[in-house]
């Protein structure tokens, strides 16, 4: 059974861990909210204000995610280029030749550069470890998580499991943030002292595995951007915010309780009506402040 809790206890963990959260996650968080009012008649309107405030804060964070969205693929691409450069230093002449065909495309961010990686990285693997069986170069779908994992070398089952979990969270309905992925990425590096009998070049393994990982990450983010996941979830959240707020304002217009300033309440209603899916986090920040006032005023009514 889900525990109910006040908004102040919410850490918005789903928004820290996911650049693209799922709608179900937001609804589950919303359903855990509760309030305690002195006047029982104020309980439902206060809860509606609490939910409106939660949705406003959620949208504010999602808008910030939208602002940083253009940097996701370039950041993953830069990490990919770094690992390719390290492989170039560690590999033999044949491996360098393959990397020379991929690295300029990654550096330039050429359209479709990830397709060349999907073809070229398995070649790097077999050139370094000729005893590895040839694997299917093309992932079966746009999601290349399993392709990525099938090419890992010298990686523990636990690391593979964590990578699968982070790249396929909630059956692909959401995508992780860079901050959350960092907690997994560091584990690639923390195996530098582990030697595998069949894959003995640990330094090489670390960088090659990271190349496979960042290729999958690029594919994941490109899919989210193409599907406009943030646009859809912001619009859906905003629709629910306005609907929830309307219930509160209808109650306020009917009973006219003293919330400190009737003009401020009406101004808050105006701000909510004016919100659009293209709103900024500045507008939402102001709205959150006024909703806090309404909430605490409702709490004090006897």
UniProtKB/Swiss-Prot annotation:
Organism taxonomic ancestry: Viruses, Duplodnaviria, Heunggongvirae, Peploviricota, Herviviricetes
Native source species: Human herpesvirus 8 type P (isolate GK18) (HHV-8)
GO biological process, one term: release from viral latency
InterPro entries named among the record's database cross-references: Herpes_BBRF1
The protein's name in its UniProt record: Protein ORF49
Family: Belongs to the herpesviridae BBRF1 family.
Transmembrane segments: none
Key words of the record: Viral latency, Viral reactivation from latency
Function comment: Plays a role in the activation the host JNK/p38 pathways necessary for KSHV reactivation from latency and for viral replication. Induces transcriptional activation through host JUN of several ORF50-responsive promoters.
